[in-house]
Regions:
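C-terminal edge beta-strand
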Residues: 244-258
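Extracellular/luminal low-complexity segments enriched in Ser/Thr/Pro
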Residues: 221-235
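Hydrolase catalytic cores
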Residues: 34-150
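Solvent-exposed, low-complexity, repeat-rich "mucin-like" stalks and linkers
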Residues: 168-198, 263-264
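Mature extracellular/periplasmic domains of secretome proteins
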Residues: 1-9, 16-34, 97, 120-124, ...
Length: 266
């Protein structure tokens, strides 16, 4: 790919490469592009035809002119003017949209970046998907026998808007697996000698977002043990003291059903 641009690969709903996507070491990042062969169901038009726009693709606005007799059911019922589509033309806008969101958030927080700095920030705001490249899947020209051929060829992972916003703000994000107990030592985020850091107060801003109750979070010094029954996000505010210096820091605790080896989420 032309080096100054960002090359985007397309993935399906199961985090695997879409059958049509290009791939290779030059791909920078992946994003949802849809894949009609990975859909579990299709939509049926009023005349009984199975329409092209299945729910394994990306919901998009589409041309809808009453003077044109379309053959794909796009004027049926509540779908008027909308359709499920697929392609890198769907994947690329995900990345450009997240980039625009990040730049707007940076302006709101008084942050400025050079193009190279923001590109690096954007491309590092991903979650790993290579572990999903297993088995086979259907494609336009027949089954794709071995999904492992895509490994290390779909960029650093799938674009993660939440991770980009945390990076812009400078908020540390702690990712945990939904439904599994975890103990996190937050002392390392306060610098210096960990043994001298003592917690004075800690609280989740929105514990309900994670399915947490007061009895499900155990605070032991700077270590917090908790189990998030629900996927979601909550800010965690910790007050601590090291010697005669007091600190207050906020963390984003993100609960996801699956975690990638690189610390991202699936």
């Amino acid at each position: 790919a032309y080096d100054p641009v960002i090359a985007v690969g397309a993935m399906d709903w199961s985090f695997r490469p879409a059958y049509y996507t290009d791939y290779g070491p030059w791909v920078d990042i992946a994003a949802p592009g849809g894949d009609r062969y990975s859909g579990k169901t299709t939509r049926t038009a009023s005349d009984g035809r199975t329409v092209f726009y299945s729910n394994a693709q990306i919901l998009s606005t589409i041309l809808c002119d009453d003077a044109i007799a379309y053959q794909d059911g796009r004027k049926d019922g509540g779908m008027y003017g909308y359709g499920f589509m697929q392609g890198t033309s769907m994947a690329c806008p995900h990345v450009s949209g997240v980039a625009a969101l990040g730049l707007a958030y940076a302006a709101q927080n008084g942050k400025k970046y050079t193009p190279a700095e923001f590109k690096a920030l954007l491309l590092s705001s991903v979650y790993g998907i290579d572990d999903c490249f297993t088995g086979s899947k259907d494609g336009e020209l027949g089954p794709i026998a071995d999904m492992a051929v895509y490994k290390n060829k779909m960029g650093g992972g799938c674009i993660d808007a939440l991770k980009l916003l945390f990076a812009v703000k400078g908020t540390p994000a702690v990712y945990v697996r939904t439904g599994e107990p975890v103990t996190v030592d937050f002392a390392r985020y306060f610098g210096g000698d960990r043994s001298r850091v003592a917690q004075t107060a800690a609280s989740f801003a929105s514990p309900g977002n994670l399915g947490l109750s007061s009895s499900k979070a155990v605070f032991d010094g700077m270590k917090i043990t908790f189990d998030c029954p629900e996927p979601g996000t909550s800010m965690l505010r910790i007050s601590a003291v090291s010697g005669d210096t007091e600190f207050v820091r906020e963390f984003a605790v993100v609960s996801r059903a699956g975690l990638a080896a690189n610390g991202g989420w699936l």
